[in-house]
């Protein structure tokens, strides 16, 4: 999806790249057209462009990963870390507070309760996603399960507010 491409581009920079650029295709252009009535001109690479490094990754062979403190690029396969009790679960921010993320969480939590020792915080990536999540009832499911909603956008990933964990807390988070 376009949203997944945006996440990959954002995370490329988080792990040290200067940029994470994807050539726009019709799907990306339609996504932009649906969000603005202003004209725009897509940017494409020159026909004879040279690259320092060009990577192709077969995502179908990737296994779920978990980043360990305190860097997003210190990762291990999730199956290799064993069971670790958590104190906070954070879903959201600009990178991973997408509609699909919130929908999946809502469906998992429907009819269930968040553990009383766990603080579950949801930060939609944007106002648009917040409104969609309200309309579709996803946030109601999450709140009924014991989750907490915070304003869309940045927060604990920059260490400023809305979900900054307590000392010694283990946190599972989609934030970058």
Regions found by a protein language model. Give the residues of each.
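Fe-S-dependent hydro-lyases/dehydratases of central metabolism
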Residues: 1-176
């Amino acid at each position: 999806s376009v949203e997944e491409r945006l996440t990959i581009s954002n995370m490329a920079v988080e792990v040290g790249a200067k940029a994470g650029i994807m050539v726009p295709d019709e799907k990306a252009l339609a996504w932009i057209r649906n969000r603005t009535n202003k004209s725009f001109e897509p940017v494409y690479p020159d026909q004879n462009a040279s690259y320092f490094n060009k990577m192709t990754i077969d995502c179908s062979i990737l296994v779920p990963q978990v980043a360990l403190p305190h860097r997003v690029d210190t990762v291990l396969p999730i199956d290799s870390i064993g069971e670790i009790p958590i104190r906070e679960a954070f879903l959201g921010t600009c990178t991973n507070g997408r509609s699909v993320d919130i929908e999946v969480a809502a469906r998992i939590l429907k009819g269930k309760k968040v553990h009383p020792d766990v603080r579950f915080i949801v930060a939609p990536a944007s106002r648009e996603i917040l409104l969609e999540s309200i309309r579709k009832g996803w946030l109601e499911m999450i709140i009924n399960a014991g989750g907490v909603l915070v304003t869309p956008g940045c927060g604990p990933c920059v260490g400023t507010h809305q979900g900054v964990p307590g000392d010694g807390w283990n946190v599972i988070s989609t934030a970058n």
